[in-house]
Amino acid sequence: MSVIIVGGGMTGATLALAISHLTQGQLPVHLVEAVAPEASNHPGFDARAIALAQGTCQQLARIGIWQAIADRATAIGTVHVSDRGHAGFVTLEAQDYRIDALGQVVELHDVGLRLFRLLQDAPGVTLHCPARVASVSRSEASVSVKLENGTVLD
């Protein structure tokens, strides 16, 4: 049995690394990604920034990912939540909860490059990039994926 992940953006790359870590490379993972992460036109790793909750950062640390991106993160100390047109709002301060940060902000391009470096050394992970899916065949017992280059993954 193996796992085939199509799409190596933030979610797919993180899933592949998590499976590798949690199974110690014993469950083979094929990650298929159409665009190299260093490409300026990568749709998942562009110049956008995302906010990660502190709990997410802690989970990423548990599976060995956060350590690779932490030096490029910016801590979130304050969160202001309001609803336009309504009187209510709330402001959360990390110091009120005696924590360093409520979360972290990271730029997707930096994260993508670092995730793909981790993927290259992740036990049990085979990276197919750049590669595209040509067809998927299903049976009661299995699924196989044929890539445009002729490689068949099952």
Describe the residue ranges of each PLM region.
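N-terminal FAD cofactor-binding segment of flavoenzymes
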Residues: 42-85
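Conserved N-terminal helical subregion
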Residues: 74-154
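Acidic-histidine catalytic/liganding microenvironments
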Residues: 22, 63, 122
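Hydrophobic/small residue at the entry helix of a nucleotide-binding pocket
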Residues: 11, 15
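Glycine-rich FAD pyrophosphate-binding loop
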Residues: 6, 18-48
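Glycine-rich Rossmann-fold phosphate-binding loop(s) that bind the pyrophosphate
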Residues: 7-10, 108
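Extreme N-terminal starter segment of soluble prokaryotic enzymes
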Residues: 1-3
